[in-house]
């Protein structure tokens, strides 16, 4: 296994070297080295409890690395072998990293209360649940994670049969320490991906694992899906055609890059195809926005105007949508033109670019420049949903 780090895989958060800079650039796992933790030592219960207790303190990185190695070893007899095979099948270059000595007994133990609930019978479930809880900090900031722990962790832990996780220390300082370990550029994130892959390889829990790994939709995203389906039904439009019409021209190329990236992974040959879905785990709204795909508010505005033409009153929900007044006018005009376009067999009419151009002319006048079409910030805040699963 090579130790050369040409690029570090960080859940698509920090891909370096212009991997997605232009429409012709393709994402290639073979250019990325994926560090993988393992252990040469046997795990005993006290070692695991010590590691759990130190999560959130100065020993967090080593403790979580050891816990990842423990779950890998317990899940497959060949230890990291299965994980390595799957990751290599996806095309990654692997670097093997030893977790080293057991956790330092002098480190602080902010999660001691959780560690004390661990016994031989529940150690694997509790540790796995802890790792997946920590993994959420690769997606959510400390404040949002604290809200998640306060509002949803107990219910979710109980539903997953890991009630011990209610003892997880959700102090913001503890969460910040964990987050600093799991942030982009930290090798531990990749070890947690190993846990995800192992779970995917076990048919008994594949459904839960896929729910965890699949790209999650926030409340905003789910609302848009519902609006989109209703609009397609109202218009009698093919969903693909309607989606193309809704993609504002400022975002089309970025959308294509994301689709290309995901297709490359999903179409990987052999066993890798089954695990391609894990690559989308971290593609939340924020990362789509990072590549220019920040049209959620605008598309929602258009969809609600479409549906209002079939169900009077739908547009009342537009009050809280974060778009400018000029765009609200444009959205109404686009909706009107889309209704005209699909008033028939649902497939004829002018293309999206021409339709949007006409709508702009009608709603804003021909003299308005494209400079005012700059994307607006529509970063909706949403809590982690119940689809966050531990196993």
From Swiss-Prot:
The keyword Transport does not apply. Residues 346-391 are annotated as: Disordered. It is found in: Virion; Host cytoplasm. InterPro entries: Rhabdo_ncap_2. Keywords: Capsid protein, Helical capsid protein, Host cytoplasm, Phosphoprotein, Ribonucleoprotein, RNA-binding, Viral nucleoprotein, Virion. Pfam families: Rhabdo_ncap_2. GO terms for molecular function: RNA binding. Residues 368-381 have a biased composition (Acidic residues). GO terms for cellular component: helical viral capsid; host cell cytoplasm; ribonucleoprotein complex; viral nucleocapsid. The keyword RNA-binding applies. Homomultimerizes to form the nucleocapsid. Binds to viral genomic RNA. Belongs to the novirhabdovirus nucleocapsid protein family. Encapsidates the genome, protecting it from nucleases. If expressed without protein P it binds non-specifically RNA and therefore can bind it's own mRNA. Interaction with protein P abolishes any non-specific RNA binding, and prevents phosphorylation. The soluble N-P complex encapsidates specifically the genomic RNA, with protein N protecting the genome like a pearl necklace. The encapsidated genomic RNA is termed the nucleocapsid (NC) and serves as template for viral transcription and replication. Protein N binds protein P in the NC through a different interaction, and can be phosphorylated. This is Nucleoprotein. The lineage of its organism: Viruses, Riboviria, Orthornavirae, Negarnaviricota, Haploviricotina.
């Amino acid at each position: 296994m090579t130790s050369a780090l040409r690029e570090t895989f960080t859940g698509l958060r920090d891909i370096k070297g212009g991997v997605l800079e232009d429409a012709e650039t393709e994402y290639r796992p073979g250019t990325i080295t994926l560090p993988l933790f393992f252990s040469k030592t046997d795990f005993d219960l006290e070692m695991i409890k010590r590691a759990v207790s130190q999560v959130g303190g100065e020993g967090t990185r080593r403790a979580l690395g050891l816990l990842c190695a423990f779950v890998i070893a317990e899940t497959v007899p060949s230890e990291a072998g299965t994980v390595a095979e799957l990751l290599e099948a996806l095309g990654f270059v692997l670097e093997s990293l030893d977790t080293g000595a057991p956790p330092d007994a002098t480190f602080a133990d902010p999660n001691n209360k959780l560690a004390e609930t661990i016994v031989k019978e529940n150690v694997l479930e509790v540790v796995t649940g802890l790792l997946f809880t920590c993994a959420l900090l690769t997606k959510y900031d400390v404040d949002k994670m604290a809200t998640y722990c306060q509002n949803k962790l107990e219910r979710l832990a109980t539903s997953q049969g890991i009630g011990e996780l209610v003892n997880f220390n959700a102090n913001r300082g503890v969460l910040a320490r964990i987050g600093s370990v799991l942030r982009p550029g930290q090798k531990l994130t990749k070890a947690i991906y190993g846990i995800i892959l192992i779970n995917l390889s076990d048919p008994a829990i594949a459904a839960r694992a896929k729910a965890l790994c699949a790209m999650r939709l926030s409340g905003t995203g789910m609302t848009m899906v519902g609006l989109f389906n209703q609009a397609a039904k109202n218009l009698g439009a093919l969903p693909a055609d309607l989606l193309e019409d809704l993609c504002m021209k400022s975002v089309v190329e970025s959308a294509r890059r994301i689709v290309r990236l995901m297709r490359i992974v999903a179409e990987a040959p052999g066993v890798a195809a089954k695990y391609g879905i894990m690559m989308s785990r971290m593609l939340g709204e924020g990362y789509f926005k990072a590549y220019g795909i920040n049209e959620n508010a605008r598309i929602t505005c258009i969809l609600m105007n479409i549906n209002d033409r079939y169900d009077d009153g739908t547009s009342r929900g537009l009050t809280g949508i974060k778009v400018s007044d000029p765009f609200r006018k444009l959205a109404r005009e686009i909706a009107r033109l889309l209704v005209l376009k699909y008033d028939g067999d649902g497939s004829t009419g002018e293309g999206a670019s021409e339709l949007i151009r006409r709508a702009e002319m009608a709603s804003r006048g021909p003299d308005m420049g494209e400079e005012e079409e700059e994307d607006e910030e529509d970063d909706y805040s949403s809590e982690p949903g119940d689809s966050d699963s531990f196993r």
